[in-house]
Curated annotation (Swiss-Prot):
Native source species: Trametes versicolor (White-rot fungus)
Keywords linked to the UniProt accession: Copper, Disulfide bond, Glycoprotein, Lignin degradation, Metal-binding, Oxidoreductase, Repeat, Secreted, Signal
Reactions catalysed according to its record: 4 hydroquinone + O2 = 4 benzosemiquinone + 2 H2O
Xref: PANTHER family: LACCASE, MULTI-COPPER OXIDASE
Signal peptide: 1-23
Intracellular or extracellular location(s): Secreted
Enzyme nomenclature, EC number: 1.10.3.2
Record: residues binding Cu cation 1: H87, H428
UniProt-recorded name of the protein: Laccase-5
Cofactor: Cu cation
Length: 527
């Protein structure tokens, strides 16, 4: 760790080599985290920003690249956290568990006035990802942005004409009150931002600018849809256009035609849009499941504009979805079978995670996750090898190496109350993708070709979503609800995978070892 060490000299080189000219950065870059006032929906508030913008700048690279992202913490605002971490959502971090970014699982936070270099490779991954703070609810205050790893040999390349920085679409919930100053569980966002712009339906809002996405009639576009949400899921659609899904969270899938996509916090999809309609303006809609749930006056909206169309707001009308995305229709393009034997419990280790809530905290198997003062990775490197020795007590599960694992998430109702209110809860597993052998809304198991992803909705009452993965990546990996307010209330566990080989598989840099002493020395006002 260093004081504001800079990589700007190599940033210019990497940008010139990548040829991407729409403001993207990476794979070698500085990423400065600072406070600034922003007005994305007509209301001004102080925020935590990456690169001085919301959402944070698009970070790009190619399959096989080494990413070297130097995070510089310039945070000073007393109403929000001054320390930070960055998680690279969906990146496996094989051999670099220390760079996964989950505070108190994989690292101590970066102290204000300091920097830390995240250095990792993506040898076997390509697709649509994102990055965000993984310290308490900090990303709800603005520290979130898209990450794309391009594949020069993309199997789907023949299906589209355009795939660049202009075809990334982020969906965000936005709050006018800093996360630590507001309620523990907000009733809903104040607005929804599409690529950083939206409208607030309350006092002081009005007809603010909306994001305009421009297409040329006759071309086919690969849009990369990224939910950088803290809480709500969105129903996404584009008036007058169908979408063909080809990628789910960094995994290529068979082409699937839909006219709406329900997308949960942390999820990503690539879809092909054929710009085959008349030259005009069309509403893009992203309706959240909480807060304002319509599009009156252009809230929850952006604009799809064909080249040469008049620069006015659309007059198109929403229609009832007739081919909405159904998760069980998604089929991986390569190696589609789930790990293990094709039967219930046909794995090396199966477990059920039972949820509960006491009014202020969430529990998994009767334990609420309380961040330890010593990161789980550091505990393992210091000699702790079994669950009984690892903190937080009851929230760390050791997993054997090279084994098939099955996890079930039963959602039940007792005396009229859900075991975990605020459903549906999207659960994200770090360090892996998994096969969803039973999806929300389904009572059947699919072992032959289930969707493969890293973030899944666990559904509603009566659901028992079940996932499978293989333990081929030593280290501690977070499994948690991606509704960030729920995570902050303890809705998480850690899988300590192959603890015996964690140290040899994940050599840590000196700068990582310096993080905890620096953070632990901070005054409470600088945390």
């Amino acid at each position: 760790m260093g004081k504001f060490h800079s990589f700007v000299n190599v940033v210019a080189l990497s940008l010139s080599l990548s040829g991407r000219v729409f403001g993207a950065i990476g794979p070698v870059t500085d990423l400065t985290i600072s406070n600034a006032d922003v007005t994305p929906d007509g209301i001004t508030r102080a925020a935590v920003l990456a690169g001085g913008v919301f959402p944070g700048p698009l970070i790009t690279g190619n399959k096989g690249d080494e990413f070297q992202i130097n995070v510089i913490d310039n945070l000073t605002n007393e109403t929000m956290l001054k320390s930070t971490t960055i998680h690279w959502h969906g990146i496996f971090q094989a051999g670099t568990n220390w760079a996964d970014g989950a505070a108190f699982v994989n690292q101590c936070p970066i102290a204000t006035g300091n920097s830390f270099l995240y250095d990792f490779t993506v040898p076997d991954q390509a697709g649509t990802f994102w990055y965000h703070s993984h310290l308490s609810t900090q990303y709800c205050d603005g520290l979130r942005g898209p990450l794309v790893v391009y594949d020069p040999d993309d199997a789907n390349a023949s299906l589209y004409d355009v795939d660049d920085d202009t075809t990334v679409i982020t969906l965000a919930d936005w709050y006018h009150t800093a996360a630590k100053l507001g309620p523990a569980f907000p009733a809903g966002p104040d607005s929804v931002l599409i690529n950083g712009l939206g409208r607030f339906s309350g006092d002081g809002g009005g007809a603010t600018n909306l994001t305009v996405i421009t297409v040329t009639q006759g071309k086919r576009y690969r849009f990369r849809l990224v939910s950088i949400s803290c809480d709500p899921n969105f129903t996404f659609s584009i008036d007058g256009h169908n979408m063909t899904i080809i990628e789910v969270g960094g995994v290529n899938h068979e082409a699937l035609d839909v006219d709406s996509i329900q997308i949960f916090a942390g999820q990503r999809y690539s879809f092909i849009l054929n710009a085959n309609q008349s030259i005009d303006n069309y509403w893009i809609r992203a309706i959240p499941n909480t807060g304002t749930t319509d599009t009156t006056g252009g809230v929850n909206s952006a604009i799809l504009r064909y080249d040469t169309a008049e620069e006015i707001e659309p007059t198109t009308n929403a229609t009832t979805s007739v081919i909405p995305l159904t998760e069980t229709d998604l089929v991986p393009l390569d190696n589609p079978a789930a790990p293990g034997d094709p039967q219930v419990g046909g794995v090396d280790l199966a477990m059920s995670l039972d949820f509960s809530f006491n009014g202020s905290n969430f529990f998994i198997n009767n334990e609420t996750f309380v961040p330890p003062t010593v990161p789980v990775l550091l505990q393992i490197l210091s000699g702790a090898q079994d669950a009984a020795s690892l903190l937080p007590n009851g929230s760390v599960y050791t997993l054997p190496s090279n084994s098939t694992i099955e996890i079930s998430f039963p959602i039940i109702t007792t005396d009229g109350a859900l075991n975990a209110p605020g459903a549906p809860h999207p659960f994200h597993l770090h360090g892996h993708t998994f096969s969803v052998v039973r999806s929300a809304g389904s009572s059947t198991f699919n072992y032959a070709n289930p969707v493969r992803r890293d973030t899944v909705s666990t559904g509603n009452s009566g659901d028992n979503v079940t996932i499978r993965f293989t333990t081929d990546n030593p280290g501690p990996w977070f499994l948690h609800c991606h509704i960030d307010f729920h995570l902050d209330a303890g809705f998480a566990i850690v899988f300590a995978e192959d603890t015996a080989d964690t140290a040899s598989a994940n050599p840590v840099p000196t700068a990582w070892s310096d993080l905890c002493p620096t953070y632990d020395a901070l005054d409470s006002s600088d945390l």
